[in-house]
Amino acid sequence: MTTFPSAESASCADSFGGSAAPVTVFGPDFPFGYDAWVKAPTGLGVLPAEALGREVAVIGGGIAGLVAAYELMRLGLRPVVYEAERLGGRLRSERFPLPTAHDDGASSDGSSEAVAELGGMRFPVSSTSFYHYLELLGLRTEPFPNPLTEAAGSTVIDLGGETWYAETLADLPDLFKEVAEAWDAALEREFGLSGLQEAIRTRDAQTLKSLWNKIVAAWDETSFYEFVSRAEEFADLSFRHREVFGQVGFGTGGWDSDFANSMLEILRVVVTECDSHQELVVGGVEQLPVGLWNRAVNDSPRWPKGTTLASLHTPRPDPSEASRTGTPRGAVASLRRLADGRIAVTETSGEVCSYDAVLATCQSWLLTTEIDCDESLFSQSLWMALDRTRYMQSSKTFVAVDHSFWKEIDPHTGRQVMSMTLTDRLTRGTYLFDNGPDQPGVICLTYSWMSDALKMLPYSAEKRAELAIRALEKIYPGLDIRSHIIGEPVTVSWESNPYFLGAFKGALPGHYRYNHRMYGHFMQEDMPDSERGIFLAGDSISFTPAWAEGAVQTALNAVWGILTHFGGRTHPENPGPGDRYPELGPVELPE
């Protein structure tokens, strides 16, 4: 657990050089500047005239699918999006249907509504490709109220029945400082964290690769907990220190749910500062994928000015008649390779369409559960990687409250009556969202992973809220949380949804090779024809699962792959990820 400067101080610079430049998600496995590629005025590439207007199936309307579809439309292709539920995927903002305190009967916009972020809710500013699309749509962000941040105001840590109130790390007992110092020192001694981050700041790809490749070879088969338990910085400390580290974590809360994961997975998060400087999207992050669906392109070589993904999905002869009524195709039931080499996509309704290229952005397990997929579309080694992907469970339960009552000061203690809360009780993490004066507030009563999430799985939203409130009442005796709740609770367990089967990937020790196979699948030049034309994207295909940046970067990989598949090319002055992959691609470990 560490304290961090405000997100404003970490805003992304336009140039990358010197220690003043920010840390971004530049690698470390594949140090390619996706943000620079997508922002370049030359564009992502050029298609041959005969390819313009050709259809590409995009399975999944989450952020990976929508980014890819939007960029493919800009290039001049016709994306056909298939979505089983609703646009957004795990960027799902559930709105509480509540009037504002000064409701005059007029409809209110998203900024005045209480929102429960059921999926992605905190977005590190190091995610510069993801933020490119936020900026494109003019969406606002604010610092996320993580523990011990200015945005949270105050934090309560409740462990083993003992409770501490803090506004900074200095307010906590020495035990917590010792844990934070041990973690930071272990990262620096074992991995040279500052050197890795300096290479990222300066975008020195060769230095970064030389450092990171050695780490991959040495640490792929080591778990997060093995690192913590064996590090000499923790060896002189008690088991209690490791226990506190698991319960409280560093930056964003407890990490014991990740103790079984590969240390490489955790190190990537730390090296790229995904664990710090996080922001929320005002009004809900679902505005981003929905906004891309409705955003007009004005620079496409094929589509008239004003064309949107929505208008391409409406039965109108002129796609320039931009419409917000366009809807994606439905859920996909099967994928088949046809005799002519095209790929047939069958919907659950029975409708069949064939395509020269298909992009699957769904969770990889769906290719063997919900979708009857020709085995010949992927190599057996890739099937092994797709099936061995391990998804983590996640549960959240939210309630809307009449106002941000937790900011009130207890006259007896001089402290806020309630705080962002980390605990070993079943709530684990409780987050408080202040929507401003005279506006309803939102409480994420509980955000938990893995076994803690499974405790909630069988129960209704009402029962989950009741269990969480009971736990919080033990931490805040005398505080009447219930009296402030308005409306019904909102909850999610991603593992119970057949179109997700889990919240996000958590790679286990020894999974690097699997990740490498999935991530590099967009490089299809050496593949047999039977495996070409189907592409993969999504955060679980990336090296940074659970972060939207990974979804965006793999979507851009797929865009390059599809561009190349149709005979297109990038601009010489703006090479794409596939152009640099032979030189900078992830290190290959022996099989």
Regions found by a protein language model. Give the residues of each.
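Conserved flavin/dinucleotide-binding core of flavoenzymes
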Residues: 2-43, 342, 393, 400-401, ...
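Flavin (primarily FAD) binding-site architecture
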Residues: 357-381
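Glycine-rich FAD pyrophosphate-binding loop
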Residues: 73-98, 102
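N-terminal Rossmann-like FAD-binding beta1-loop-alpha1 element of flavoenzymes
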Residues: 51-81
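Conserved beta-strand-loop-beta-strand element in the redox core of flavoprotein oxidoreductases
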Residues: 329-352
